[in-house]
Amino acid sequence: MAKVLYITAHPFNELVSNSMAAGKAFIETYQQQHPDDEVKHIDLFETYIPVIDKDVLTGWGKMSNGETLTDDEQMKVSRLSDILEEFLSADKYVFVTPMWNLSFPPVVKAYIDAISIAGKTFKYSAEGPQGLLTDKKVLHIQSRGGYYTEGPAANFEMGDRYLRTIMTFLGVPSYETIIIEGHNAEPHKTEEIKATSINNAEKLATTF
């Protein structure tokens, strides 16, 4: 039995968002095909994720020195630890994000910062940093209003490229994507684009 974290980063649901519609289709099909697997939904817009700020950095330093943390430091550090442990407990991750300003919503970066911890998800060595998530799988479902997979705007896309890069850095050997794009560039194709992405999601769910 595998544990899947279904991590969504969109303020709207599948009735409004193309990425959320594809994500819903994927996870429903996945659960049908893998009834014994555990799926946990994490809505990043409804989840408290402390940003790494002065309290967090100071708290980590105090922990290393065996010093007492303030209430705010303890609360933030403990919450980040809980997020990390939940992430480590899973076998597969499904990220669902829109493209915002060439990347993804800032809550995704906050989440990535929470789980990118030396000694837990990667380590330093004489040969350089080494990822520790060598038995995990990732799927990223991303919706883009324009066309960024190829063409003149391809080099501007920084969301999926960043997520792929950080997951590779953390040692993840399997990273797949479902890209939904072009519905703003060609509004008359919106329903076709959405239907294709849902079909792709349902197909991938059988083998992920």
Swiss-Prot record:
The UniProt record lists the keyword Flavoprotein: yes
Disulphide bond pairs: none
Keywords: Flavoprotein, FMN, NAD, Oxidoreductase
EC number: 1.6.5.-, 1.7.1.17
Keyword Hydrolase annotated: no
SUPFAM superfamilies referenced in this protein's UniProt entry, alphabetically: Flavoproteins (SSF52218)
Cofactor note: Binds 1 FMN per subunit.
Cofactor(s) annotated in UniProt: FMN
Single GO term (MF): oxidoreductase activity, acting on NAD(P)H as acceptor
Residues annotated as binding FMN: 17-19, 99-102, 143-146
Enzyme class: oxidoreductase
HAMAP family: Azoreductase_type1 (MF_01216)
Record text on subunit structure and interactions: Homodimer.
Family of the protein in this entry: Belongs to the azoreductase type 1 family.
PANTHER family reported for this sequence: FMN-DEPENDENT NADH-AZOREDUCTASE 1, FMN-DEPENDENT NADH:QUINONE OXIDOREDUCTASE
Protein's UniProt name: FMN-dependent NADH:quinone oxidoreductase
Species whose genome carries this gene: Staphylococcus aureus (strain bovine RF122 / ET3-1)
